[in-house]
Amino acid sequence: MIVDAAPSLGGQAVGSIIGTIIGLYTHGPQPYQITHGIADELIADLTQEGSLSRRVSMTGTITFQYDEVRLARWIERKVEEAGIRALVGAVLTGVGFDGRRVRHLELATRFGSARVEARSYVDASGDATLCYQAGLEVREPDAPVYGSLNFIIEGYDTDAVKDLVIKEVHDRLAERGSQYGLVRHDGFLMHFPGKTVMLANVTHFETPLDPAAGAQMVFEGRRQADNIIRFLRAEFPRIFANAKVRTYGNPGLRQTRWIVGARQLTLDQIRSGERPADAAARCAWWVELHNAKELVHWERFEPDHVYYIPLSCMVPREADNIVAAGRCVDADVSALSAIRVMGPCMAMGAAAAHALDLAAGGSVHEIDMTALQNRLTDNLDRRS
């Protein structure tokens, strides 16, 4: 079963319009794919229907821009085809936990309460919600890590946009952005080839774990999106004179709260690229820390540099039947900023499912790592 607090499936990839799939390939003159499985199916299916655009980036890697509406339907179809029951619009209100095991979940929906019992659980909430509600130890950043509200632009000149130079936009944001109520000086504006829409990721705001602040994140993100449109119309009228927002995404959260695992992945470990004995996923994305309003902090690695996520940073040290996947695994702030992107999240999801399957009714801390890595060989060793 999959449980989602949103009224539909897709997480931030759909609801927050992340808009790009990154982290599937290495960086370098000949980048190669390091995460496979469901990623291969997604690329093949969405490419065939024209909903995915392959991009060779200026940083020497391969990323994909996707149509979020078509991705949402693809996810729904895949869930149905796999026979997975989905419970949407379900907010976690309580966790039955004893003897180092989650026994059941208590959920609230607009149609009434629900209770879910399972042998094992994956915390893919992004905010370590399952572990937090179970009373397990969690971590939070010492300083803000900024989120973004992505949005889709339409009405711009699709011929003139070919002349858009993003560095000129960045320079103008640094010079005049404050006059339009803007705080961020970088980000991207990405026209979808063959379509009449553009993805915008150029906002920054704080994302506190405060229930009363949720609406303010939406308001502030949309206010910045509106101000970006004003800025583009005034500063780049040849392209954006008639531009407008077509769709606002939900606030995109990056690093808010994460588990305390059996071990913590560190920046030094991803710099070294040393493969741990319990490697469960392979990564190559650079450090991308949104710790300042104005600019993202990047730390770039050498071409073809890869590093690994150990299973021990995905398993809460106080629980036997939970594996975390995604941006709530245990890593220091810098390391987490590198592994939280979509490619590694897919790899962690696969590792979590296989680890819990091997654990059966026992402890995920005690599984046969050779058996797990044999199942995950495409994501750990394949070079293609």
What is the meaning of each model-derived region?
Residues 95, 107, 151-155:
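Short beta-strand element of the conserved SAM-dependent methyltransferase core
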Residues 4-94:
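Conserved N-terminal/central alpha/beta ligand/cofactor-binding core
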Residues 16-19, 101-103, 154-156:
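Short low-complexity, flexible loop/linker segments enriched in glycine and/or proline
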Residues 12, 89, 113-120, 125-384:
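Flavin (FAD/FMN)-binding glycine-rich loop and adjacent Rossmann-like elements that form
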Residues 76, 92-93, 103-106, 119, ...:
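Short, well-ordered alpha-helical packing segments
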Residues 96-115:
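Conserved beta-strand-loop-beta-strand element in the redox core of flavoprotein oxidoreductases
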Residues 1:
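Conserved beta-strand positions in the Rossmann-like core of class I SAM-dependent methyltransferases
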